């Protein structure tokens, strides 16, 4: 099964299955001298961890174990290997789907490709979103390394089901949405999202949503014409996330309804520098980052595992039947998905920053390491929850 690695210079390989002993990641290409601790990784992992309010009831602690690549809280330049053990596995929930593939899931395509006898039906196996633990671990490393360029990445849930954000949001609000149980950047939206989640849970159903990720101060010129354009690289990275069904940046599909005179973003002087008036392009022109905020959005489909009965085929007799999926599943996978999107944006940007020479390939100087650590600590402090009146 190829296709488990991502990136060229900053290369990430994830491994493990939902109900196997552990999931994990190997990160190759991290320069030596980057300050990095288990706590740095846990900070990001916490926001995709199950067992919290409004997400899957699977109670995993998600404690990362660093196996290699770090010594005295600094990267050594060798591959970084990290695992997270699966400690709350109940495979008995999945005995029924052993013979009844779930609608909306990868069950049947995996059986068709790899063979029924080779299919790990427990929790979805390799197709499970549990795989994204490795992405978030690598994303934490990438986010910290990007602090060398003072590049910050944060996301929020722009819509959930029929409810959506219809007003401007500040980057500070997006940062603080990490502590919203539904990743809302506004208090009024948080209440609407929570009501939807409660309704879906009661009905045995689920909702989809749109995640938006904003990158502040991205290095200029990232991306390589023609086939490695930044928009193409981000699209591939984000579309590889389980349950993601669509991608856009800037104005996205809205530009298809506009005239050129409306969609073109005028070039102006901003703070004694050349810039764009409205950033309609979302920070990418000609496939290159232009220094404006990098704004991407993606659509998550509703969680496929729902209690409502749905038609399927019993593989033992090839007769039509019904399945009601039991177990512990997210009523809206988009909530935890926001952190995964952040991670894939970070992995894409850090790889291109290294290719462009913005980040050193071999090692960080002691001064660079200290700068990174100071900025990282400021980032962590900035993610503290706002007072209710500020949300």
UniProtKB/Swiss-Prot annotation:
UniProt key word Isomerase: no
InterPro entries per UniProt: Chorismate_synth, Chorismate_synth_AroC_sf, Chorismate_synthase_CS
GO molecular function, one term: chorismate synthase activity
Catalytic activity: 5-O-(1-carboxyvinyl)-3-phosphoshikimate = chorismate + phosphate
Annotated CDD domains: Chorismate_synthase
Gene Ontology terms: cellular component: cytosol
Function: This reaction introduces a second double bond into the aromatic ring system.
Descriptive protein name: Chorismate synthase
Gene source species: Saccharolobus islandicus (strain L.S.2.15 / Lassen #1)
Gene behind this protein: aroC
């Amino acid at each position: 099964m190829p296709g488990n690695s991502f990136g060229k210079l900053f290369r990430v390989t994830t491994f493990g299955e939902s109900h196997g002993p552990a999931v994990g990641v190997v990160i190759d290409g991290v320069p030596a001298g980057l300050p990095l601790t288990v706590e740095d990784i846990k900070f990001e992992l916490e926001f995709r961890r199950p067992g919290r309010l409004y997400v899957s009831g699977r109670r995993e602690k998600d404690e990362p174990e660093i196996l290699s690549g770090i010594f005295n809280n600094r990267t050594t330049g060798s591959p970084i290997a990290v695992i997270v053990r699966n400690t709350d596995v109940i495979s008995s929930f999945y005995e029924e789907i052993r013979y009844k593939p779930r609608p909306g899931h990868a069950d049947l395509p995996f059986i068709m490709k790899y063979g029924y006898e080779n299919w790990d039906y427990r929790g979805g196996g390799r197709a499970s979103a549990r795989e994204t633990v490795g992405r978030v671990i690598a994303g934490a490393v990438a986010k910290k390394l990007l602090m060398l360029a003072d590049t910050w990445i944060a996301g929020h849930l722009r819509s959930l089901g029929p409810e959506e954000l219809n007003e401007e949001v500040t980057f500070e609000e997006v940062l603080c949405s990490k502590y919203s149980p539904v990743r809302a950047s506004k208090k009024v939206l948080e209440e609407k999202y929570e009501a939807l989640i409660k309704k879906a849970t009661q009905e045995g159903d689920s909702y989809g949503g749109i995640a938006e990720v904003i990158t502040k101060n991205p290095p200029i010129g990232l991306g390589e014409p023609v086939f490695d354009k930044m928009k193409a690289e981000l699209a591939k990275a984000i579309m590889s996330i389980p349950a993601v069904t669509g991608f856009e940046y800037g104005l996205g599909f809205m530009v298809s309804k506009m005239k050129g005179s409306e969609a073109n973003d005028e070039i102006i002087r901003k703070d004694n520098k050349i810039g764009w008036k409205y950033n309609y392009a979302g920070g990418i022109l000609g496939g290159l980052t232009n220094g404006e905020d990098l704004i991407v959005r993606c659509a998550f489909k509703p969680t496929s595992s729902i209690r409502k009965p749905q038609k399927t085929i019993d593989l033992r007799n090839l007769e039509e039947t019904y399945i009601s999926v039991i177990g512990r599943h997210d009523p809206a996978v988009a909530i935890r998905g926001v952190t995964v999107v952040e991670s894939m944006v970070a992995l894409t940007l850090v790889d291109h920053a290294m290719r462009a020479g913005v980040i050193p390939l071999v090692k960080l100087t002691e001064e660079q390491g200290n700068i990174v650590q100071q900025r990282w600590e400021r980032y962590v402090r900035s993610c503290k929850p706002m007072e209710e009146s500020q949300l």
